[in-house]
Amino acid sequence: MAFPGQSDTKMQWPEVPALPLLSSLCMAMVRKSSALGKEVGRRSEGNGDAGGPFPAVKFPIKDIQFSESGEGTRFLHGARLSPLSRNIKARLLLYVRASPLFYESRITLKKPSNRHEVKRNRCNRKTAKQMLMTTLFNELEPTRKYGITEDCTSLNRVLFSANRKCLHKSLYKKDCFKAAPFSMFSFR
């Protein structure tokens, strides 16, 4: 499948540092009744009609584009993270289903290739996930002033740029992200 501005050749996800990437991503689930979600869904790269489902799409991290109006919005993404710690390789795959009804983000982790490495470092798959979540929330602390409005389950996914500026800041008010539950992330 050819993506905008790209050929049909196999996509190569870039190696990116874990912390800057995690600090630049904040996700919230969208409720079906979200007018914003429906509007952004209509403007997505899908080929269906405005009311029908759109296919899941992936874009390189460099192709993420958001505007306050929702125009030009593109959907992500796959990115290969550098190691979170020695001998632990984590792969962050954020699949955003470009549907007018909902968005779903998933984080998947690759198991360490060597069982002895796991035992030696006393780290397993569950611990790696906990590390990833802890890092994400700790790194997002400085960005919470941008927050998200109402409750975390009713709003569009929020993306922060690398310089910690909220790209949809006009749509959100501060200090609401603190209530965000871990359950808004789906681990696979």
UniProtKB/Swiss-Prot annotation:
This is Uncharacterized protein IDI2-AS1. It comes from Homo sapiens.
